[in-house]
Every structure is written in C-alpha cells, then in structure tokens.
C-alpha cells in the first residue's frame, strides 16, 4: 500500500465495520499518519514471514500517542511458515507489545490464500467492536477530509470519518475556507439521508470545486467551531529519542488527517528529555477547528523522526508562553479568562 485504502464488512453479529488500510513502508509514513487520525481501534498486522519490523515499532508508538486503547494483532501469511516459525512469530509479537495497549490483545494467525484463521478473526473483530467506546454525538459534526475527488455526474466528493455529530442531505457546511451544501451521503456503498458519528462517509458537495479542497481540511457545520492558529497541549516525548525536545527544529504536527508545519514553544522549561511528559504551545500556519482532547503526533522533518505527541488542552491560550501552565480543568480556564465555553468542557 502506498496511500490510504478503504474497506468495510459486516461482522457475524451484524455490526458494520470500516477499515482504513495505511501503508507500512517508512517512505509513506505521512500517508499513514493521515489515515490513523480518525480511528478508534487497531487491527495491527505483522507478516509471519518477516516478523516485527522497525516500522511496526513506530506505528505502535504512533497509535499510543493518538490514545488508541484496543486492538487485534493479525499474523498474516501463516501458510508460508511452519508451526515452529509461527510460534516464534507469536513470541516476537508478544515481546514487542508488552507494556502497550496491545499487551492483552488477541493474536490471530491468518492466510488470505487458504482462508485459515479468517473466521476466528471475524469473531475477534466482533469482540473488539463490543469493547470499543462508541462515538458520542455532541451535536457538533466534524469530518477530517482524507480524500477529495470529482465523481462523474455528481461533482465534488470528500470522504472521512465523521465524529461529534450528524450530517444530513441539504445541510449547509463549511469545508476548509469554503461554504458548501451536502447533495448526498454514502456509507458502506449505500446512499443515506442522514449519518451519525463514528462512521466512514462520502459526502457529495455542491457550491465548491474539488480543486479548492485538500486532504487535511475539516468539514464542519457553520458557526459551531472556534478556529485557532495556536494551542497549548500536553506532550509525551518518545523514550527512543536520542536528544531532548527543544523549540529548535523543523516540526510538523499531524492533526486529524492533516499535516502542518508548526512552530513550537516548550512551556515551563526549556527542554523535555526523552521519555518524559510536559507541555508545549504549537503555532499553526492556518486556523483549524480544534477542541480540547484532540490528539496529535509531532515529527521533526529535518531528522525525519517521530518526536512524540499529545493532547490539546487549550485552544485559545491567553497567557504568554513564559507563564502558561495548561491543563484541562475548568478552574484553570476560569482563573485565566474569567469565563468558560461549551468547547472547553467537552
């Protein structure tokens, strides 16, 4: 896989499950990051013929930075190894996921060629869906666009994972900087008049040309979101880093499905050591509809490495960076501003 792939299936329970297939090769990590921003669980694939790879490690760390809490590990190509090598692959995976959210995840060996293990995998996917927190409806829909194209006879189409609220046909929306109207909606290959959060959806739009939109844009309802070009956030610096995190560097933040060159200021100190937690202020090149609790991954493009990631704490910081000590408490927001908004308590 070079770019994102999309698929869906109906599980034995009748639950409908959507997949975002992300590329594994290091050269396409930016595409991987564009795809994982909207996921709630992971099907973590390791080829039994190859075992754990350096990119497996980076993908696992990225999923942890994004707050993913549940998943299933799948050992593919199991028909190409004997029983001893398959057992070694199991042990290899168990060693690497120890201490992570996948530590207690089921490991299923499968073969796409023979069909071995696929029924077991479908049962485990049902169990995964059952233990994964359902998307909540806050009445504020947001869809980070991961694909834009023009459909013959229909016009502009954007796709993404819907969160936060519902979309309906004929609804007015804002995508990036452009106002538009929803002509039609599709999910899992069928047309619908309304769609709820936690769903992969294709949105056919009128009033905007597909050339004016791009991956990383957000589709939202008008006048529901505060756009911000700076925010304070918690950050965890990866332990594997061989240097401290400072304000110096060519940083890129991956938020939703977007990739944004950012400036960074470490809060409360000058540096953060590998394996530690702290706070940062990030300055974006363009304003985005963010809210506290949104997750991000931080990379340093000069070194071509993942630095860490964290959670948005304050979408409208009022204190100078030298004085800021952000957290998600209402007390802190009221103390600094004297007021609080609905977005601050979500």
Predicted features along the sequence, with ranges:
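Helix-rich terminal scaffold detector
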Residues: 1-3, 11-18, 38-46, 72, ...
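Conserved Switch II/interswitch segment of TRAFAC-class P-loop GTPases
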Residues: 16, 22-28, 36-88
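Conserved nucleotide-binding/hydrolysis micro-motifs of P-loop NTPases
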Residues: 25-26, 49-53, 68, 77-82, ...
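Solvent-exposed alpha-helical segments within well-ordered globular domains of core cellular machineries
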Residues: 30, 34, 44, 54-61, ...
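Conserved catalytic-core segments of large NTP-driven translation/proteostasis enzymes
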Residues: 78, 95-241
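C-terminal effector modules of nucleic-acid-centric enzymes and ribosome-associated factors
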Residues: 81-85, 95, 107, 208-346
């Amino acid at each position: 896989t070079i770019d994102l792939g999309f698929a869906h299936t109906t599980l034995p329970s009748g639950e409908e499950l959507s997949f975002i297939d992300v590329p594994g090769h290091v050269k396409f990590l930016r595409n991987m990051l564009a795809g994982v921003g909207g996921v709630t669980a992971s099907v973590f694939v390791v080829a039994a013929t190859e075992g754990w790879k350096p990119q497996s490690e980076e993908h696992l760390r990225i999923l942890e930075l994004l707050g993913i809490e549940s998943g299933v590990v799948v050992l593919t190509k199991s028909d190409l190894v004997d029983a001893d090598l398959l057992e070694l692959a199991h042990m290899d995976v168990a060693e690497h996921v120890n201490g992570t959210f996948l530590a207690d995840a089921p490991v299923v060996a499968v073969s796409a060629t023979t069909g071995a293990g696929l029924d077991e995998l479908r049962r485990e996917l049902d169990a995964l869906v059952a233990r994964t927190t359902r998307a909540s409806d806050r009445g504020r829909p947001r869809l980070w666009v991961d694909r834009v194209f023009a459909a013959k006879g229909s016009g502009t189409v954007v796709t993404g994972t819907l969160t936060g609220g519902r979309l309906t046909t004929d609804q007015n929306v804002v995508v990036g900087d452009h106002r538009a109207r929803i002509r039609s909606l599709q999910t899992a290959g069928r047309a619908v008049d309304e769609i709820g959060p936690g769903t992969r959806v294709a949105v056919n739009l009128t009033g905007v040309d597909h050339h004016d939109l791009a991956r990383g844009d957000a589709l939202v309802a008008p006048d529901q979101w505060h756009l911000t070009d700076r925010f304070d956030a918690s950050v965890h610096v990866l332990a594997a880093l061989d240097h401290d995190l400072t304000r110096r560097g060519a940083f890129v933040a991956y938020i939703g499905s977007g990739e944004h060159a950012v400036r960074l200021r470490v809060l409360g100190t000058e540096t953060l050591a590998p394996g530690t937690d702290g706070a940062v202020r990030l300055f974006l090149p363009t304003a985005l509809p963010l809210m506290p609790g949104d997750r991000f991954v931080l990379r340093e493009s000069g070194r071509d490495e993942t630095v860490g990631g964290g959670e948005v704490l304050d979408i409208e910081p009022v204190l100078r960076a030298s004085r800021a000590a952000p957290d998600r408490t209402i007390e802190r927001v009221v103390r600094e501003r004297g007021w609080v908004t609905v977005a601050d308590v979500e």
